[in-house]
């Protein structure tokens, strides 16, 4: 036995331990689920490593978890014969949180126990959940393939530090002993532990065993002798891979508990799909849509993907090759009969079997979402609130499924008068006016800016619906989604409005006449504004506002410019087209001005007003204020 060393917990571990004890007190029994789940993972890892090194089994290939309790001592012990840990592994895994985005996780905590418990659950507490019920935790572990005298003893009271020393342990694997708090001694009861195992761990694919006491010899009802039986370790769970069982035999509760096992989420899944595929490729998949987005969904370093099994043997976590990035929220597993047991991430990358499975699984998930949207609109809105912005990445990433993804998108609309994104493109098409051939939309900084944009005035007057987009990703989305079901998506802030048959002959004639009559005014404004605009035109889209700016058909939009600037990207100079409304009193009075200097000032003021309305900011706000003050002063004389 080596000299004992004391190590301090990583700061984040101290925070997590404190938060757990104070936030998860209402669901204490999850400690057993977490520790059994970890033990099962250790067995999976050993099985995988033993594929290339059978000696790691050390003559004991029957993998299992054993749980025992000592009422007198007030202890619970969870023991496995899985892969075990080395000394360095113990210090790394039981003293730190090696997760990217950990600091961000702690920032998101609110201090409200119910909310924080959900967030902590998403983060995944694993081993540290032991301290919810234990005043001290003792871990004895030996890594597979290491000598008996290279085992490690780890111990901590969950305060600020832990001790580590080298010990001798005859068998490989990990043994965790919880020294229960005085008010948690209920967990040192065999029947209590059995009920928790049945509730949370029935789906674990290796036996979770508890000691079954033997019985002495006794007399039977007819005076015959019933022989004594010896005690033995009895499996408390079904110990078969849940995904290999018949769907009709699996309860919703079992599916939900399995979801929590593989995802380490504390909340139920929103929906799931369990399928066996036969044909050119043979595989089983069990896919879950979570009910809540993980706290680190937008973290670029976050690992995602399905658990991969080959012929029931665990191969790897986070096999991202089977799921496109825009579906990275999907949890679950895939079990293939066709891939080799020695498959690596590199082999998966360019494998035709992988690509075929990815295509099939992607279609399966999209089908799940389509069915949910059709059968339960309220539940689909719950999904959209959590994952809608991620799904919007789809049209750019997955050309083959672009139309299906587009059908799943939801937007706010002038039809509903609400900021809630509840309108699908199919809803929009079903309400299109007779003769309407385009789907009209606007992208702005906020819902209010979109809903109140002057670009909508004529369309509102005609009762034509406009989709209102205000998320950062919407401009990116719309650049890759130009049509849906042969209907072109058309921005009301770009190029010509193009109402087509929605504009009758009389309106067209009136518009042409107005443009002709206003030609001298337009030329004067062009001269006044010079190089600050690409063009000046009579508007066809305004009814109540004097002027607006419009992006040219081939030019970069205002929102895309903002996105690129925010990302520190160089942005080309884009000059707007300035549209004026000659019917507005301000513009008609402007036309009457004979003083060309005053005319130029008023023209510039109208332009900057329009730019402020469109962009929400100006390149030189102080110049705008100076000009406005100058104009106010001149008119207050």
UniProtKB/Swiss-Prot annotation:
By its UniProt entry, which InterPro entries does this protein fall under? HATPase_C_sf, Heat_shock_protein_90_CS, HSP90_C, Hsp90_fam, Hsp90_N, Ribosomal_Su5_D2-typ_SF
Q: Which SUPFAM superfamilies match?
A: ATPase domain of HSP90 chaperone/DNA topoisomerase II/histidine kinase, HSP90 C-terminal domain, Ribosomal protein S5 domain 2-like
An example Gene Ontology molecular-function term: ATP hydrolysis activity
Domain of life from the UniProt record: Bacteria
Cell location:
Cytoplasm
> Mind listing the UniProt keywords for this protein, alphabetically?
ATP-binding, Chaperone, Cytoplasm, Nucleotide-binding, Stress response
Annotated region C: where? 563-637
Q: What is its main location?
A: cytoplasm
What PROSITE patterns has UniProt attached to this entry? Answer: HSP90
Q: What are the start and end residues of every segment in region (B)?
A: 346-562
The protein's matches in Pfam families, at most eight in alphabetical order, are given as:
HATPase_c_3, HSP90
Protein task: Molecular chaperone. Has ATPase activity.
Q: How does it assemble?
A: Homodimer.
> What family, per the record?
Belongs to the heat shock protein 90 family.
Q: Which PANTHER family match?
A: HEAT SHOCK PROTEIN 90 FAMILY MEMBER
Q: What is this protein called?
A: Chaperone protein HtpG
Q: Which organism is it from?
A: Shewanella oneidensis (strain ATCC 700550 / JCM 31522 / CIP 106686 / LMG 19005 / NCIMB 14063 / MR-1)
